[in-house]
Amino acid sequence: MPTHTPEIISETTYQEIATSGKLGPTKHGYPAVIFHANDTVTKLWAKKTGWLSSSRWRPYSTRFIKNAELLKQEGIHTPEIISHMRIARNHVHLVQYHSLPGKSIRELLVHHPEQVDIPSLAQYFYDLHEKGIIFRAIHFGNVIQISTGKYGLIDFTDVSFLKYPVPLTRRAANIATPLRYREDVKCLKESNLPDFLEAYLEILRKNIGDFDENAFTRTIKERIKKRS
């Protein structure tokens, strides 16, 4: 695992990296991600420059690397990180890593919905929560299906690690996150796949027993409505 202290690279070196791959959407004047032909990815963070920004003291790239370490310790599949860099005299940090094998759930929903196993996917979310892991920005685009019933995570800059299973209220908020994406929900419905929320609720019923299911689903609906 690369050090949390980035290697300083020149602007020329950065340009060589940028021109060697396919650029993703631009953010703060730089591509958020670069996809390379050798199945590696370069993720970029153009650090916020405000004095009160926490990224001044703890860059997002460092959080990403640390989260990868902690997730691996919990048995979660994450990309193998290759290098950690910062452009000289600049606020841009970069992390290069090997792509996880497989396809995102989002890709599969569009092109091969028959390969999506909703019960096992719901179980994966449940297992994360039981381990005390809250991936705040989780959605079907950053959950990778490595093989049937086997998953991994990408783009995990913002993750919390609790020392106990995630409380139900926070689980509901987390489950609401992927259900805010209308195109994903549309694909789920059009593919006649089992309902994702119902699959998660069924796991809760079997493992937790009595809980306020109405309050749980109400929290999810409120979160979805708030963000839509």
Residue spans for each PLM region:
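Juxta-kinase regulatory segment immediately upstream of eukaryotic protein kinase catalytic domains
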Residues: 1-22, 217-227
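C-lobe/activation-segment region of protein kinase-like
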Residues: 151-228
